[in-house]
């Protein structure tokens, strides 16, 4: 394992017992439970028929895969060149860019009112494709940076585990929705509450585990890179899906799927490939990248929700326009004795004493 042009080994060591402490194990267990609960809840919003439709007409899935494995690795490679990163820094960022979509994309797609069926199909297809695409992309883009064979470092077992975590609870949720739909509201509400509580626990344990070690990667160029990478994914994923004329719901879904990477796989590759004295504090770069993913994703959700409140629905706009047009046309019609030409002029009728109105006038 050799990286070109590394000026000197990092004077850096991980916290004592890192990865084997009680807090580390507790964090891992809570993360798995939270992911299972999230996937179960998301499965309750899906339908087999709609999943089948996306598989039979995979236009959205193909666009998403092109965005995931075309845009993100290229963005990571170009950002490394633009900011003149060292080779070890560029390699750490490239590994993140070549990773498949993560589970956070499913949760944020729900918040963005995207197509949940497409989101789960995309996450599954992205993970399956990563078994072949990840080694290929790392081989192509790491030329001249890394002398070793990165394809042997791809955590195939981790990818398969992530697929199981997605598919099994989602399938249970779909079956519950079709067979026991009255349970779905309770699962969704309970899932949201428990997920929020677990998120608080995850945040607290992460701070305890990492401590101030993450401060070592908060250099200006790494901060800029880790902020621009997810932004590039969100933006280019939306633009690419718009070019292929997908509906707004699918555009938002592909945007989220492209911008969110599987950070756990990035950390695994860095941990397996490089010893601490080589990778140094860049071991924590995936965590910094995840922070920017979450922050930018939440900002996009806030902007989208505000836009929804300001802009009236299209149907309501049409109804208002038609009503206003009718009111403007009514006075002119009444002057001619008709309204829209459907009501004939009023004919003289008999008065109570048997005389018509003309005779009464005489």
Swiss-Prot record:
Catalysed reactions listed for this entry: taurocholate(out) + 2 Na(+)(out) = taurocholate(in) + 2 Na(+)(in); taurochenodeoxycholate(out) + 2 Na(+)(out) = taurochenodeoxycholate(in) + 2 Na(+)(in); tauroursodeoxycholate(out) + 2 Na(+)(out) = tauroursodeoxycholate(in) + 2 Na(+)(in); glycocholate(out) + 2 Na(+)(out) = glycocholate(in) + 2 Na(+)(in)
Q: Which InterPro entries match?
A: BilAc:Na_symport/Acr3, Bilac:Na_transpt, Na+/solute_symporter_sf
Ranges annotated as spanning the membrane: 23-44, 48-83, 87-112, 116-142, 157-179, 184-217, 220-243, 248-273, 281-311
Question: What keywords tag this UniProt record?
Answer: Cell membrane, Glycoprotein, Ion transport, Lipid transport, Membrane, Phosphoprotein, Sodium, Sodium transport, Symport, Transmembrane, Transmembrane helix, Transport
**Where, per the database record, does this protein carry Phosphothreonine?**
330
Where would one find coiled-coil regions in this protein?
A: none
A GO CC annotation recorded here is:
plasma membrane
Q: Which domain of life, per UniProt?
A: Eukaryota
- Keyword Ribosomal protein present in the record's keywords: the answer is no
Q: Membrane topology per the record? A: Multi-pass membrane protein
GO MF term list? bile acid transmembrane transporter activity; bile acid:sodium symporter activity
Q: Where is the composition biased (Polar residues)?
A: 353-362
Matches recorded under Pfam families: SBF
List residues in topological domain: Cytoplasmic: 45-47, 113-115, 180-183, 244-247, 312-362
Q: In which tissues is it expressed?
A: Highly expressed in liver and low expression in kidney.
Q: Which residues are glycosylated?
A: 5, 11
Major subcellular location class: membrane
- Tell me a GO biological process for this protein: response to estrogen
Give me the ranges of the annotated region Disordered.
333-362
Localization: Cell membrane
The reply on keyword Phosphoprotein is: yes
Query: What does the sequence similarity comment in the record state about its family?
Result: Belongs to the bile acid:sodium symporter (BASS) (TC 2.A.28) family.
Which PANTHER family did the record assign? HEPATIC SODIUM_BILE ACID COTRANSPORTER, SODIUM-BILE ACID COTRANSPORTER
The record's annotation in NCBIfam families points to: bass
Free-text function comment from the UniProt entry: As a major transporter of conjugated bile salts from plasma into the hepatocyte, it plays a key role in the enterohepatic circulation of bile salts necessary for the solubilization and absorption of dietary fat and fat-soluble vitamins. It is strictly dependent on the extracellular presence of sodium. It exhibits broad substrate specificity and transports various bile acids, such as taurocholate, cholate, as well as non-bile acid organic compounds, such as estrone sulfate.
What's the protein called, per UniProt? Hepatic sodium/bile acid cotransporter
Organism in which the protein naturally occurs: Rattus norvegicus
Gene encoding the protein: Slc10a1
């Amino acid at each position: 394992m050799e990286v070109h042009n590394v000026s000197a080994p990092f004077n850096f060591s991980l916290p004592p017992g890192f990865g084997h402490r009680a807090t580390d194990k507790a964090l891992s267990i809570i993360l798995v439970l939270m992911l299972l609960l999230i996937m179960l809840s998301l499965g309750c919003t899906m339908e087999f028929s709609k999943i089948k439709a996306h598989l039979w007409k995979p236009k959205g899935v193909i666009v998403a895969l092109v965005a995931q494995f075309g845009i993100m690795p290229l963005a990571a490679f170009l950002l490394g060149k633009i900011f003149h990163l060292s080779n070890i820094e560029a390699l750490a960022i490239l590994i993140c860019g070549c990773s498949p979509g993560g589970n956070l994309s499913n949760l944020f797609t729900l918040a963005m009112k995207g197509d949940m069926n497409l989101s789960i199909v995309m996450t599954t297809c992205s993970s399956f494709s990563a078994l072949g695409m990840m080694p290929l992309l790392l081989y192509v883009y790491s030329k001249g940076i890394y002398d070793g064979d990165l394809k042997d470092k791809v955590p195939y077992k981790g990818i398969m585990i992530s697929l199981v975590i997605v598919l099994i609870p989602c399938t249970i949720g779909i079956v519950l929705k079709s067979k026991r739909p009255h349970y779905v509201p309770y699962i969704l509400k309970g899932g949201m509450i428990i997920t929020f509580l677990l998120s608080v626990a995850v945040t607290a344990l992460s701070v305890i585990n990492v401590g101030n070690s993450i401060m070592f990667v908060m250099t200006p160029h790494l901060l800029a890179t880790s902020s621009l990478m997810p932004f590039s994914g969100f933006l280019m994923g939306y633009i690419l899906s718009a070019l292929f004329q997908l509906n707004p719901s699918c555009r938002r879904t592909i945007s989220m799927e492209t911008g969110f990477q599987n950070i756990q796989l990035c950390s695994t590759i860095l941990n397996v490939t490089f010893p601490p004295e080589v990778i140094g504090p860049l071991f924590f770069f995936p965590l910094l990248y995840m922070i920017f993913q979450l922050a930018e994703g939440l900002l996009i959700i806030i902007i989208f929700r505000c836009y929804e409140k300001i802009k009236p629905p299209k149907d309501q706009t049409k109804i208002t326009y038609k009503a206003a047009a009718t009111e403007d046309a009514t006075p002119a019609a009444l002057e001619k004795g008709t309204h829209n030409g459907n009501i004939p002029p009023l004919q003289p009728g008999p008065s109570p004493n048997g005389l018509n109105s003309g005779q009464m006038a005489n």
